[in-house]
Amino acid sequence: AELTAELTARKKQYNYYRDKLLSFEEGDVEWRTLGEVAIIGTGSHDTQDAIADGEYVFYARGRDPLRLNEFDFDETAIITAGDGAGVGKVFHYVQGKYALHQRAYRIVPGTAMNPRFVYHWIRSKFYTYIQKASVSSSVTSLRRPMFLNFPMPVPSITEQGRIVAILDKFDALTESLTEGLPREIELRQKQYAYYRDLLFSFPKPEAASAASA
């Protein structure tokens, strides 16, 4: 329980510092829309095109990427599904060749933007933005205008790089905790089960009699 609580606390701490780093007042930086600073488009493939041992990563509608033997793009981009599980919450950062589903979006930042800065900003702010923009209580699908009109701060490239360096370190720390703590929790649970079984393993009467003979 302590380890699980620690993991939750660290994630909350990370989110707090990330949001603080990504807080810009109206007059502090130039504000544009995502459509003004990035190319936004979709892919052409369907989920049924996937091949288990395909050569290239294939970003579809699910949380986890698939594989395909052909690629659509060779670039640095932020990818997210247009609908399906985790819509508006799950984002992938890709560098190199990849294939893309027809209902998944690619966001390719222009020269004024550090791609990692755009990635962190979208991960932090996009879901809240689409919830406010949606007429229903839950967002089930994304449309291109949602991306085009998404507000985007444009600090200097130097400042973007400074923020990215900090947030990337936070990401690495959180990832190592997320991977390491569950293993530690599992190990502790196994240890507990072992000692519990040891405590409650009483010798059978026959064994006890034989031992006293």
Per-region residue spans from a language model:
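Charged, alpha-helix-forming regions
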Residues: A1-A213
